[in-house]
Amino acid sequence: MAVFFVNGTEVNVPKNQKLLRYLRDELHLTSVKDGCSEGACGACTVLIDGEPCRACTPSTDALEGRHILTVEGLTDEEKKLYTYAYGEAGAVQCGFCIPGMVICTKALLDQNPDPNENEIKNALRNNYCRCTGYVKIIAAVKLAAKLKREGVIPEPSENDWKVGSSVHRLDVEEKVLGTGKYPDDWYVPNMAYGSAVRAKYARARVKAIDASKALAMPGVYAVLTAEDIPGENKVGHIKHDQYTLIPVGGLTHYLGDAICLVVAQDPETLEKAKKLVKVDYEVLPAVHNPWEAAEENAPHVFDEEGTNVQAVRHVARGDAAGAIARSKYVISQHFETPWTEHAFLEPECAVAYRDLDGDVMLLTTDQSAHTTLHECSLLLGSKKIKVQNQLVGGGFGGKEDMSVQHHAALITYVTGLPVKVKLSRAESLLIHPKRHPFWMDFTMGCDENGIIQGVKAKVVSDTGAFASLGGPVLERACTHAAGPYAYENFEIEGTAYYTNNPPAGAFRGFGVTQTCFAVETLLNEMADKVGITPWEIRLRNAIRPGGVLPNGQIVGAETGLVETLEAVKPYYDAAVRAGKPVGLACAMKNAGVGVGLPDYGRCKLIVEADEKLHIYSGASCIGQGLGTVLVQMTVTNTPLRREQIVYERSNTWIAPDSGDTSGSRQTMITGEACRRACGLFTAALEGHTMHDLIGQEFYGEYYAKTDPLGADKPNPVSHVAYGYATQLCVLNPKTGRVETMVAAHDVGKAVNPKSCEGQIEGGVVMSMGYALREQYPIDENCKPIEKYGRLGLFRAHEIPDIRAIVIDKPGLDVACGAIGIGEITSIPTAPAIADAYFRYDGERRTKLPLADTPYERKA
């Protein structure tokens, strides 16, 4: 028992528990986020007697007489200050880490009203952010300090919300102050808690499940097995091969497979009950890697499949082998890239309950409410379900698949109980699909001038325990492996294998991150062989408007690769003159699904009773700022002012399906659908008032038409548009650490330039981790790392100077010229860093994370 103070109010806490649990579960102070419950991420930071502390570490009994402050307890003036500063700096993306950052900001400024950059970085060092790269958070703290010293807090400008303006994001206030709700922030009356009993072995036959002891425990409501599923057991993003619950007699595929679902009155009872469920297994040999999977007598990961090959892709044009044979210079290398964890700050969570219509209402954090609806409807064998997106605490591709949504929906549908299903951080690290590890063999041929003659490659990937998006990732890796260059002869063969490892699927870059590392590293080596600079060899080979890519596509006027090269040239030359090691790499990345697959953007505008225009789209906002983009599109394409427009969060009963938030597609695809709907609304408004239009709907749809892979055309259109980038890395010649990263990105038209910068900075820091030290080790039992703090993510005090250069290049005739930028920001970073280290010590590195650097993590 303890008596202490929370936000100035005395509280009496009879039950000893973690402070985090008391603040969230009993006081419902949901600005205090639960990101890991292990003292690593900092999302739960509060002040205890004025000092920052992670709320998941102290127990309440140890807090006698102490004073606890959360964001809810800030003064009105402080709330206004931090909301403005974080909004003006562009520091808010997914928002999950932000209340913790705000608390650290207050602690610093209370003690030091004029901190320098190093002092700010040090104050934030215990708090992770996976979205922003910290640059704009640091800028927000600087601005908050300045405004606090001056005693004046401006109002955000609402005058110019047109495309091209760096406005404050729509959701800044609710994310800064913690008032916006993520699924874990929901508390439904009489809510139960559900969780899965997971497989004990990566590959085993389930012989029996005995839940009798768990069911006899007071406070346990139900234990559901595969026999309780009313519809289809298997779900999957494209291929239905992921079991919701492994049946008796069924085979486990990895340690994350769910055997049964336990439902209880509270989390403590739930965890105790799970331990009472007895599962009898026949343990079988596991498949650990693609080489084992490919063996002639290898055990099959799936009973239903006659092979462990999950996908094969072959992309060819011209005569690569012949062109290479005729080349003056030829280089071959083997490359390897690792598993990578998304490490979004918000663990997966879903809340389900019966609404007044008797439907299952599912509150989720995922990358497509309509995809969740489709898969859960098949599982339940019923259309009596609705899905509502809440705030999403980061995704990066890792929230495209089912994780908890289907389990929550099943529990409520079968038992009638409202329920929350949330993954622990260890479960999250195990369950959602990761970035594929790749093994790649590349050969490149060039002429005496460094002009690429041909590239030939073979790649192998480990797609883990189920298909997820393994096939499309492999395809994208292959179609982009040629790089953003103008040559004809190209051939690549790719194979993805099932194993009993955790699944691999979508991750920022979608396979291109892996093959770009290979082809760009080869090109840097080729430049040395030819005797020209890495910058010059790229300029000579760069695709230009009207040019033909190796896949045969003729690129449009919006193509801006050369502009990105020219933008980094002054930095490149300055580093060379100063004798600093500098590395360079380019990249391209499609916007939209492409390759002939259906790719629709849809948007509905409704004039509602408040005489405002409400924007509805099924597209999920996962931190990239889509809602702000659509409002800016609407202001640009209608006569309305910002205050006359309302953005509604994605749902499945009003908002039309606009596909997944993936593939850097939503700004362009749904943005164009919104623009078209705006045209219909504007025509209807002519000669009328908003009051006249109440109840009217205006529907916009855009179909991004492309040609399928292997289309019998000389110049197929594989994608509606591509983004282009050049990044360079400058090392400190004395320490060998990264001193500066420069990233120039062609984005078509920047809808919100400051948000574009934030995407670039965040992508660069994420891929610095990929290049230099992030790890996701998997042991001999197919068990991965369990601790968030051991992933090797970069912290605020470790980031270098990052220069984001946003290049507007007109030419695209959709979505006001905007091209998506979310993925490409992470693609060229690793090869640029690898080349810088070659310039530093003469060692060519072809495996990630890079060995023998100051960042290397020793075992």
Regions inferred by a protein language model and the residue ranges of each:
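Signature of N-terminal electron-transfer/Fe-S-associated modules in redox systems
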Residues: 1-156, 595
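Short beta-strand elements
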Residues: 46, 174, 180, 349-354, ...
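Glycine-rich loop/linker segments at domain edges
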Residues: 90, 165, 171-177, 238, ...
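Flexible, low-hydrophobicity surface segments
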Residues: 145-310, 414
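C-terminal catalytic domains of large/alpha subunits in multi-subunit enzymes
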Residues: 226-227, 381-384, 414-419, 448, ...
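Phosphate/diphosphate-binding loops
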Residues: 258-259, 264-266, 417-464, 672-691
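Helix-loop-helix junctions that connect adjacent transmembrane helices in secondary transporters/permeases
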Residues: 295-378, 542-612, 692-717, 721, ...
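Thiamine diphosphate
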Residues: 395-416, 420-422, 626-633
